[in-house]
Amino acid sequence: MDTTEGQASDWFAMTALASAGVLWGVSFLFGKWALEEMGPAHVTLLRFSLASAALLPYALLKGVWPWWRDLPLFLLVGFLTVPATFLIQFWGLSLTGATVAALIVGCGPPIVAFFASLFLGERLGKRGWSAIGASTLGVALAVARPGVSNHWLGDALVLLSLLAVVGWVLLSKRLGDRYPAVPATAWILTFGTVTLAPVALLWEGVPRLDLTLLCWASVLILGLGCSAAAYALWNWGVARVPASRAGIFLNLEPLVGALLGILVLGEAWGPATIVGGALIVGAALVVSHRSSV
């Protein structure tokens, strides 16, 4: 491959990664719109039913099936990914603003790095600990927004969902060693959707179908765009560029989510929101460069 072809390949890979980051960022906006007419369990169920239906045929086409010995791990990771992460996250999103929810989710990389140092023995140097401290302070500033009350439960639920993120990120490393990324993701989301279905039906009953066009469009974008397409784009891009460069694009999620919350939804913000957001994104950026942490 000559230099020009290599540069073109890098450009396409980085475009894919940036697109995935943006799609994850817009999920907070479309999530808020969907939650205006549906409960969090139904939004999560429909989102990942669509995502599974879009990705699973690819896994089957590639002939990738879970080994029997890995079924319990797929089931556990699926549960941690869909009900434990996104059901709790959407529940929190229904009680708080998209801006702060997006910024809290931006703390994911430092939190994962912290638990990886505890359970996987991954090195976390001074810059890593500084990033964790900065992200913690950033969340404290971001949630203390002006003119908003009764948002603490929602903020706490979104933060709680990040503990589930830690679980499935660390456990999915085992699956990543034995399965291609996109087929593994397809099976994880499928198992996760199956574990969510009884919870959603018991909690909120049968999903309504008499929804507005905006709500249906939001659900479709959440399932096909923010889940299926985003995961496929991310896995394709991350296989073609160094991990330290790929991780930078994760910072688009909190940035895009927070900006849309302010500009489109008109959510309250202030200097503390900006400073808190900057600390969170900066901390995630530091952790993205794992070799220097």
For the regions a protein language model found, what residue spans apply to each?
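Cytoplasmic-side transmembrane-helix entry/capping segments in multi-pass membrane proteins
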Residues: 17, 69-78, 124-136, 154-155, ...
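Hydrophobic transmembrane alpha-helices of multi-pass small-molecule transport proteins
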Residues: 55, 75-77, 107, 115, ...
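Helix-helix packing/entry segments at the starts of transmembrane helices
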Residues: 44-46, 86, 100-107, 170-194, ...
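Transmembrane alpha-helical segments that form core, pore/gating elements
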Residues: 29-30, 51-55, 112-114, 118, ...
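Membrane-interface helix termini and inter-helical loops of multi-pass transporters
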Residues: 29-37, 93-94, 140-153, 200-219, ...
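Specific transmembrane alpha-helical segments of multi-pass solute transporters/efflux pumps
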Residues: 23-28, 56-105, 113, 141, ...
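Hydrophobic/aromatic residues within transmembrane alpha-helices
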Residues: 34, 43, 47, 92, ...
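Glycine-/small-residue-enriched transmembrane alpha-helix faces in small-molecule transporters
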Residues: 1-45, 147-174, 195-196
